[in-house]
């Protein structure tokens, strides 16, 4: 709760919350109400539990009104974008990654059984939906949404990148086997994204020859008799470009298109064109994957960050394991509240890491940047989750330093901790 209050002052993310009319919120102590709302929903404690532990400082009804009437998924995304942008200004964020790479992955979250989204998930062994997230190589979450278990996750992979309004704009996508399909490879390439998934069964996939007489020394055995139909791509190239432009300008949903492109029908000419282009891109990707050991290591490293974020966000969601309402909009908001909470904690931890590193350097201790880069901001041992909560909205004593001063006095003469 202190972390949310701190980031509310430093970042100002509560400014995005308020009535749908756009007028000033007619509630007492709006910042406090919004901080508690994010805490109640991001942790899955709910308004009643938080109000009880706050010892009548706020009622469950007041928190419910703030969550239902003053927040939407779009407003929560905007608040999270503010946090991401402030995080990106920190030097330490640049030590973790350059922001050009993103990992896309989902994790199962339990819900009640009788709702239109919930399904049984074979891989995870639970019943509910998938929290599908885009995690930057700098550890911060760029976009989240709640999707059904039964869909192919690759359908949603482009949407998160197009709806990401933050200063961190990745162009390389890493995902697992669920995060790829032939049409997705084609669409991602046309949109300027480099889709490089971790493909579990790559040995079972077809490598396509550019022409029937093309042969390759040493690796020709990887290629069968499959040949790219360049004529098909050329014929439908204007359609591919028009569709891609419509998606990039927001006139057509990438999710809607990719669902349609999942229909393997002879009459679906657009599907056949995207599939053929995807065969080209996937063949190139497979060859890059086999030839570049550093790329394989990068894919593993960034997808591990996504898995770590799932664990971190689940640790913050300590109020329960089940989303206890059947409203799909509410379920989506819970996932986004949890992302906002996690990003606030990541930003606060990154500020503390910066201050600690600068303090050690000012005391004469050598700081190895490679060692510093191994410290994850998914730090939990400094956070107290349980007990009576007291909301302190006093502004921080000082604005956190964003720059690493690992050479004592080079940037900040004198005692930086004063």
What are these regions (language model features)?
Residues 18-22, 51, 80-82, 95-99:
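Short coil/turn segments at secondary-structure boundaries
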Residues 108-119:
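Flexible, glycine/threonine-enriched loop-and-boundary segments that flank and lead into catalytic domains
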Residues 53-94, 119-238:
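Catalytic or ion-translocation cores adjacent to nucleophile or general acid/base/metal-coordination motifs
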Residues 1-53:
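Structured, charged N-terminal subsegments at the starts of enzyme catalytic cores
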